[in-house]
A protein has these predicted regions:
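Long, internal low-complexity/basic segments
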Residues: 28-38, 45, 49-50, 75, ...
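Beta-strand elements within well-structured catalytic alpha/beta cores of enzymes
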Residues: 37-49, 68-69, 93, 142, ...
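Short, structured active-site-proximal loop/turn typified by the sulfatase FGly-forming signature C/S-X-P-X-R
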Residues: 58-90, 96-101, 143, 148-150, ...
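Histidine-centered active-site microenvironments of extracellular/periplasmic hydrolases
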Residues: 61, 260-318, 325, 346, ...
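A long, amphipathic alpha-helix that forms part
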Residues: 192-199, 230-271, 336
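C-terminal cap/loop subdomain of S1 sulfatases and analogous C-terminal strand-loop tails that border
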Residues: 281-287, 294, 315, 322, ...
Length: 468
């Protein structure tokens, strides 16, 4: 006699399966929380194009250590940073919020309104640093879960303690040389001893650890070791390009050294390595500086980055096609550490996606760009230059009339009206197809407006290169 499953039970089976999967996920996190919490290493390169890795297909630059890690990772090739300038981008990684929310929109107060050596300017710098005090930073939140944390490399928001780290290298403003890292900028370029000592300390105290590794690499000065520079020097390659390529490999070497520090102590099985860059960079072949449409710009050369999660013991390698953003890293790291994820964070917790391969339930990501020099410390919108939205293959870019001051050459703002690009067919954003797709412009434009309203700034209808 054939037995049939009752209809109600047949309908319930998929729900039961989903519930069991979720229970399994939360049990796994609970086991880590009640047992051994994972160590977390956040690797942040400084000024590197999304194309400039072996695993991203660069034909010349050698990055064997990151290639190996990426191969063993959940890799998102379409990662982005919301803001393509180091200080606001790093502040997003510390707070989990967009620059328009955390208020650290540029690197420095504008010298237009107060000379850099004046008391007024120094007070503005201090006021800018104090904005981080309004947030529970990522290292602070992890500290509440029992983590020790170590800062090395670039840090703008005062000393390492001011940003919530238990240990670190940066002394911070107002000490001499305290603009964006001071002693912390030695990491990588002068070895990794401070990190090695910290790992040893955490091991002795039997504490989980969080490492913020944000070396001044491949950032200028482009002064790579001669042994690396020779590999990239050719008769037909500009020396500025060769130096930049060598800097990328030098950075990769330090990532391998960092991985070895943990592997040699047999900690790799319980350590998550996460990779992102702070902003992009396209090397100018004729000078030491970056080319247009890269750093500080809202274009792919400024905002796009690979993002990967490397934890072979727990995460199956995968090459994911979805859009992700550095805005997602704080909620994801907190979740992986078994900590509460505040509902106020705008990013997504990617834990299910990287653990279980589930699809990411998001259609659009957003970004914004501000001037390097902050026109008004208390009004982020005063320096607003760009907002953008990506949905699938489409990218809408809107340009605003915020004040630029220095670096005007980086922000020509000469394109009339909205810019729409088909990134699938035109990844370098050469052809503006806005007039051919007014419906897409309207839809994504409304999405940007819904993201947050602009009160004073207006979109740029024509060239305002000389206007504030």
């Amino acid at each position: 006699m054939t037995k049939t499953i009752p209809t109600t039970l047949r309908i319930s089976l998929p729900i039961i399966v989903l519930m069991l999967l979720q229970i399994g996920r939360f049990q796994a996190i609970a086991e880590e929380s009640n047992g051994q919490l994972p160590n977390i290493v956040l690797i942040i390169s400084d000024d590197q194009a999304w194309t400039d890795y072996g695993f991203m297909g660069h034909p010349t630059i050698k990055t064997p250590n990151l290639d190996r890690m990426a191969k063993e990772s959940v890799l998102f090739r379409r990662g982005y940073v919301p803001t393509s300038l180091c200080r606001p981008s790093l502040a997003t990684l510390l707070t989990g919020h967009y620059a328009s929310t955390h208020g650290i929109t540029g690197n420095d107060p504008s010298p237009k309104y107060a000379g850099q050596n004046t008391e007024k300017y120094q007070n503005q710098r201090a006021q800018l640093i104090s904005k981080i005090d309004r947030f529970t930073t990522l290292p602070s939140a992890l500290g509440a879960k029992g983590y020790l944390s170590h800062q090395s490399g670039k840090l703008w928001e005062g000393s390492f303690k001011n940003s919530g780290f238990s240990h670190g290298m940066t002394r911070g403003f107002p000490e001499r040389g305290g603009r964006h890292g001071d002693d912390g900028l030695k990491i990588g370029r002068e070895g990794l001893e401070p990190i090695a000592n910290f790992i040893e300390l955490a091991e002795k105290q039997d504490k989980p650890f969080f490492i913020w590794y944000a070396p001044f690499l491949p950032h200028t000065p482009h002064n790579p070791p001669e042994r690396l520079l020779k590999k990239y020097q050719t008769a037909d390659r500009p020396i500025s390009i060769a130096k930049y390529y060598a800097m990328c490999e030098w950075f990769d070497e330090t990532c391998g050294q960092l991985h070895n520090l943990i592997d040699d102590r047999k900690m790799t099985e319980n350590t998550i390595f996460i990779y992102v860059t702070d902003n992009g960079w396209i090397q100018d072949p004729t000078s030491k500086r970056y080319a247009p449409r890269s750093k500080q710009s809202p274009n792919e050369g400024g905002t796009r980055t690979p993002i990967f999660f490397n934890w072979p013991a727990k995460l199956a390698p995968a090459d994911r096609p979805e859009l992700v953003s550095s805005i997602d890293l704080v909620p994801t790291i907190l979740s992986l550490a078994g900590a509460d994820v505040p509902g106020s964070l705008p990013g997504l917790d990617l834990t299910d996606a990287i653990r279980n391969g589930s699809k990411i339930a998001r259609k659009q990501i957003f970004g914004e760009g501000f001037a390097h020099d902050i026109a008004d410390i208390n009004e982020p919108e005063a320096s607003l230059l760009y907002r953008w939205c990506i949905e699938g293959k489409w990218k809408l870019l809107l340009t605003y009339d915020g004040e630029v001051n220095r670096y005007a050459w980086t922000h020509p703002r000469s394109v009339k009206g909205p810019q729409l690009y088909n990134l699938e067919d035109d990844p370098t954003e050469e052809t503006n197809v806005a007039t051919a797709h007014p419906d897409i412009v309207a839809r994504l434009g409304q999405a940007i407006a819904d993201w947050y309203p602009v009160k004073k700034r207006k979109t740029v209808p024509l060239s305002i290169n000389d206007r504030p």
